[in-house]
From Swiss-Prot:
One BP annotation, GO: regulation of synaptic plasticity
Gene from which the chain derives: Sod1
Organism: Drosophila yakuba
Pfam assignment, any one: Sod_Cu
Main function: Destroys radicals which are normally produced within the cells and which are toxic to biological systems.
Name of the featured protein: Superoxide dismutase [Cu-Zn]
Length: 153
């Protein structure tokens, strides 16, 4: 059974991101567009809570149900919400195209109801040596976010 979800991002960065997963055993395809980004890399993560009552700050930390360190999307040791970076050319829109085998739209670890956050700076993928590298990827301010909601198939 295919599951689809959508996230409307608001803030200084704005856009729409779509999620699709064919079954609980297949990767999630993430696609969409974001505007309002400076040229360069921007951290792109799923955060724990679907709470935007205090803007992006109330979305909590990266979604990390297994207590792992921050890492790159290809790392075994990573938060489930670590989706790496999206690259802005300076023109609007910035395309989002990610396939990830760790996140899911099924079961207890589903990202539906959680928040996508776009960050001001590049995610160092846990390898930057900064005090925040192993928790946030030192990706800077939260400049756009939105709650992931279930979408019509």
């Amino acid at each position: 059974m295919v599951v689809k979800a959508v996230c409307v991002i608001n803030g200084d960065a704005k856009g729409t991101v779509f999620f699709e997963q064919e079954s609980s055993e297949t990767p999630v395809k993430v696609s969409g567009e974001v505007c309002g980004l400076a040229k360069g890399l921007h951290g792109f993560h799923v955060h724990e809570f679907g709470d935007n009552t205090n803007g992006c700050m109330s979305s909590g930390p990266h979604f990390n149900p297994y207590g792992k360190e921050h890492g790159a999307p290809v790392d075994e040791n990573r938060h489930l919400g670590d989706l790496g970076n999206i690259e802005a050319t300076g023109d609007c829109p910035t395309k989002v195209s990610i396939t990830d085998s760790k996140i899911t739209l099924f079961g207890a670890d589903s990202i539906i109801g959680r928040t996508v956050v776009v960050h001001a700076d590049a995610d160092d993928l846990g390898k930057g040596g900064h005090e925040l590298s192993k928790s946030t990827g030192n990706a800077g301010a939260r400049i756009g976010c939105g709650v992931i909601g279930i979408a019509k198939v």
